[in-house]
């Protein structure tokens, strides 16, 4: 699928930009979706997955992407990113939502409102197990070691089936 090929090649895209989330949002959560894309010369150069959330708990919002830590615009071209944001704003106005929420990995606009509800930690996984343990802050490392002592383990699964 063209969308996912673009997502896999775009440095600003995340797992949550993948096309499969559209079905999850629509079929599982029953949210109307607006998966926008931009293209130049027949090639996708930006995507923006959106879902319209209307609920007593979460209010009336257009979100990229609900129940995901990331979303927002993923683009290889600034003009494409701006066009996708503008279209999202038009859709938000047409739907009459209370707010439009774009969950970018890094803020795109300093003058847009933001919430600092979540924090992300990223660290490269080193080949040596102990080096990875030492990269974890002391208190958290003690909690990890306690989990391991109590039988916590991790496995690498070659597939999702």
What is each PLM-predicted segment?
Residues 1-161:
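N-acyltransferase acceptor-side catalytic subdomain
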């Amino acid at each position: 699928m063209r969308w996912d090929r673009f997502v896999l090649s775009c440095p600003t895209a995340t797992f949550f930009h993948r096309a499969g989330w559209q079905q999850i949002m629509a079929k599982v959560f029953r949210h109307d979706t607006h998966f926008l894309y931009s293209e130049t010369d027949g090639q996708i150069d930006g995507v923006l997955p959106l879902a319209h959330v209307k609920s007593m708990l979460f209010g009336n919002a257009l979100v990229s992407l609900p129940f995901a830590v990331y979303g927002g615009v993923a683009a290889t071209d600034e003009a494409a990113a701006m066009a996708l944001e503008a279209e999202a704003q038009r859709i938000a106005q047409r739907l009459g939502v209370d707010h439009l929420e774009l969950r970018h990995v890094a803020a795109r606009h300093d003058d847009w409102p933001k919430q600092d509800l979540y924090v992300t930690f990223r660290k490269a996984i080193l080949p040596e197990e102990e080096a990875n343990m030492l990269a974890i802050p002391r208190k958290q490392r003690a909690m990890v070691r306690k989990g391991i002592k109590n039988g916590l383990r991790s496995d690498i699964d070659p597939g999702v089936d």
